[in-house]
Curated annotation (Swiss-Prot):
GO terms for cellular component: mitochondrial inner membrane; respiratory chain complex IV. This is Cytochrome c oxidase subunit 3. The chain crosses the membrane at residues 16-34, 41-66, 73-105, 129-152, 156-183, 191-223, 233-256. Residues 35-40, 106-128, 184-190, 257-261 are mitochondrial intermembrane. GO terms for biological process: mitochondrial electron transport, cytochrome c to oxygen; respiratory chain complex IV assembly. Keywords: Membrane, Mitochondrion, Mitochondrion inner membrane, Translocase, Transmembrane, Transmembrane helix. It catalyses: 4 Fe(II)-[cytochrome c] + O2 + 8 H(+)(in) = 4 Fe(III)-[cytochrome c] + 2 H2O + 4 H(+)(out). Residues 1-15, 67-72, 153-155, 224-232 are mitochondrial matrix. It is an enzyme of class 7 (translocase). GO terms for molecular function: cytochrome-c oxidase activity. Component of the cytochrome c oxidase (complex IV, CIV), a multisubunit enzyme composed of 14 subunits. The complex is composed of a catalytic core of 3 subunits MT-CO1, MT-CO2 and MT-CO3, encoded in the mitochondrial DNA, and 11 supernumerary subunits COX4I, COX5A, COX5B, COX6A, COX6B, COX6C, COX7A, COX7B, COX7C, COX8 and NDUFA4, which are encoded in the nuclear genome. The keyword Translocase applies. It comes from Pan paniscus. It comes from the Eukaryota.
Length: 261
């Protein structure tokens, strides 16, 4: 291994950004093909390419950080700034959906009947499944914090237990959300109410699935003794992301389910 006189990680050439871009092209093209021609070939190919890219890219990052020691304190600091900027970009992403919702609901047009929810729309009861979903996500926020504290105290067993509980709560939330969609009295094509509801809650649901995957990777890494109380940014980033998902849901619940109904 060549001598290095600085603390920064000079990343070697990697094919994964290219295969990741290719998978994104295949998935977006595949979605268009699915919507218009009911063909899922491109979409399936895109999902497969994306899964393989993620697996191999994460494998490389884990090798560089855990086994090769490239993630020095200055590198970890840069990764922290990167994660903060990423979550900030996600905040603005969801801000667009809330803007669309409030723009339509605070001044409903005559086409909507002059009131909100629009004529003919029966909104979901915010005190039923949505309230249960809120409780589930708040509980998962508590359990992920428990996992973090356990890791800082080198309590391996409790960390694994708390992380597993968080993942199970995330899966339970996803199942509840899916059942709510199936039983919903309106669809995404039911005007501005249906489109804003399903796009905002659907993208949040996608983020819950991504967060659950992120935490599952962290659980596997913890089982393989990858994390210590001093070296665990992968888990810390997952915890930040999960708390962000929790906060977004609280805004969704108050805005769309409770006030919007």
């Amino acid at each position: 291994m060549a001598h290095q006189s600085h603390a920064y990680h000079m990343v070697k050439p990697s094919p994964w950004p290219l295969t990741g871009a290719l998978s994104a092209l295949l998935m977006t093209s595949g979605l268009a093909m699915w919507f218009h021609f009911y063909s899922t070939t491109l979409l399936t190919l895109g999902l497969l390419t994306n899964t393989l890219t993620m697996y191999q890219w994460w494998r490389d990052v884990m090798r560089e950080s855990t086994y090769q020691g490239h993630h020095t304190p200055p590198v970890q600091k840069g990764l922290r700034y990167g994660m903060i900027l990423f979550i900030t970009s996600e905040v603005f992403f969801f801000a667009g959906f809330f803007w669309a919702f409030y723009h339509s609901s605070l001044a409903p047009t005559p086409q909507l009947g002059g009131h909100w929810p629009p004529t003919g729309i029966t909104p979901l009861n915010p005190l039923e499944v949505p309230l249960l979903n809120t409780s589930v996500l708040l509980a998962s926020g508590v359990s992920i914090t428990w996992a973090h504290h356990s890791l800082m105290e080198n309590n391996r067993n409790q960390m694994i237990q708390a992380l597993l509980i968080t993942i199970l709560l995330g899966l339970y939330f996803t199942l509840l959300q899916a059942s709510e969609y199936f039983e919903s009295p309106f669809t995404i094509s039911d005007g501005i109410y249906g489109s804003t509801f399903f796009v905002a809650t659907g993208f949040h649901g996608l983020h819950v699935i991504i967060g659950s995957t992120f935490l599952t990777i962290c659980l596997i890494r913890q089982l393989m003794f990858h994390f210590t109380s001093k070296h665990h940014f992968g888990f810390e980033a997952a915890a930040w992301y999960w708390h962000f998902v929790d906060v977004v849901w609280l805004f969704l619940y108050v805005s769309i389910y409770w006030w919007g109904s």
